[in-house]
Amino acid sequence: MYNMYYCKRNKYISNYSFGKNNKGHITIKHRQGLFIKSSQLKNTNYNYIFKKNIFNIINYNNKKIIKLQILKKIIDYKLQKYIYKVICLNNSLNYQYKYLPITKNTKEGDIIYIGETIELKIGNILPIKKIPCGSWIHNIEHNPTKGAVFVKNSKISAFLIYIGKKYVTIKLPSGEIRLLNKNVFCILGELNIIPLFLKKNKAGFNRLLGKRPKVRGVAMNACDHPHGGGEGKNSIGRSSVYSPWGTISKGIITRKSKKYSKKLILKNRKKND
């Protein structure tokens, strides 16, 4: 059906640095080159509704509608799950391929729309202010035109609680209740991820995914790790667990106390005791 068109593939141009900097020094441990370069879930920003300068908010067109069609399920080896491969049916996008998470009650061959003036249908992508309260949503943006951040890879979707003048209130799968800008885009419906259940029957499978072996700190020398050194199997010898750089890695708050989005969080997430 699509042989008559030139389908521009949305290729994955990898900026994978193998865990090293420009001098060849290791900056990220347990990382190596990729062999399986699968199509990852990278099309998380809904900039299809913009003109050529997609990052310029002045060029926003409210009446523009993008039409997508689901082609097939494909395997994402990196995330180890299935995702949908869709094609844009608008001439302005040159029939590009995109990738989206799987929504419940959608199947291959369905038509999906993106825009502000579209109907409320499961799988459609529209502003969160157009969705009625009490709906399930996923693949949600944090700021308009910046790409989806929330609820991308979990099996439970977010719940829309209230729509106000400037902000909307949602409940995330972690139990956190927070405010969001009402102009952000999201996907209507519940997220349905079908895992692959891949059996990693050998260590070489992880090596193909770009993962190197991990060595315990207790098994290292004292010059390589704070847990290292000693004769035979010794304990850590410290009151807490430390990172390779000598900082405590348990119970330390890493979030900034004066972060700008702190005022948008109404209820913190449930922490494991």
From Swiss-Prot:
PROSITE patterns: RIBOSOMAL_L2
Subcellular location: Plastid, Apicoplast
Keyword Ion transport: no
Predominant cellular place of this UniProt entry's protein: plastid
A GO BP entry: mitochondrial translation
UniProt keyword Membrane, yes or no: no
Homology family: Belongs to the universal ribosomal protein uL2 family.
Subunit structure: Part of the 50S ribosomal subunit.
Designated name of the protein: Large ribosomal subunit protein uL2c
